[in-house]
């Protein structure tokens, strides 16, 4: 680890806790989606857990930011890290939004699209897991960061391909327009999780380049 100060170590520990909590949020939303697509009514507990996890992630973000304002890190890196934290939190925000869509709107997802939507979420989760590794290696082993940045790009690309297929199938279906629009929003929003994950990965790559040069 290339930071040894006590303040810096505290912040890095909080940062790791934050990215872990966001991963918990994503996994909970994935479980909620699976339950919903299985036509079960038992999603309320998962919805409440999603809200709790996202709130915990938010508190960790704020705590990390407050610690950073105490003067830890050089100003340039401090700004980069703040940007990372905010971007990671947006991933959790979008995941919670997906849960809101499902619980509040209850979109009528056609059977033909269920596996595609699950694949979207699987790729989004794999992208985030790769991102988490990239972010941890950013502080532990810079040489390992790039392989996980590339993995994020791959999984985001895979998700995007599934998303396009799902949307194409959706609009070929003979169903009510209102249903199409609700399902479209769900598909797009899951895609946004992968997109936001890649946005964080791009920030990590920029920090990597700065550290190298």
UniProtKB/Swiss-Prot annotation:
Pfam families hit by this protein: PhoU_div
Database matches in InterPro entries: DUF47 (IPR002727), PhoU-like_sf (IPR038078), Put_Phosphate_transp_reg (IPR018445)
Domain of life: Bacteria
Family from the record: Belongs to the UPF0111 family.
UniProt protein name: UPF0111 protein TM_0914
Organism: Thermotoga maritima (strain ATCC 43589 / DSM 3109 / JCM 10099 / NBRC 100826 / MSB8)
């Amino acid at each position: 680890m290339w930071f040894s100060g006590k303040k810096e170590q505290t912040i890095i520990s909080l940062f790791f806790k934050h990215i872990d909590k966001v991963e918990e949020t994503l996994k909970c939303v994935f479980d909620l989606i699976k339950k919903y697509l299985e036509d079960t009514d038992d999603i309320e507990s998962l919805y409440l857990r999603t809200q709790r996890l996202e709130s915990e992630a938010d508190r960790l973000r704020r705590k990390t930011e407050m610690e950073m304002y105490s003067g830890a890190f050089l100003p340039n890196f401090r700004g980069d890290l703040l940007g990372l934290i905010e971007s990671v939190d947006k991933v959790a925000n979008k995941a919670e939004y997906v849960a809101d869509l499902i619980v509040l709107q209850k979109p009528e997802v056609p059977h033909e699209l269920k596996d595609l939507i699950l694949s979207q979420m699987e790729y989004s989760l794999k992208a985030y897991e790769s991102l988490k590794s990239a972010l941890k290696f950013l502080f532990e082993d810079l040489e390992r960061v790039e392989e996980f940045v590339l993995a994020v790009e791959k999984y985001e690309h895979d998700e995007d391909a599934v998303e396009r297929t799902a949307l194409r199938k959706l609009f070929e279906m003979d169903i009510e327009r209102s249903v199409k629009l609700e399902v479209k929003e769900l598909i797009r929003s899951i895609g946004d999780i992968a997109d936001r994950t890649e946005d964080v990965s791009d920030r990590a790559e920029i920090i990597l380049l700065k550290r190298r040069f």
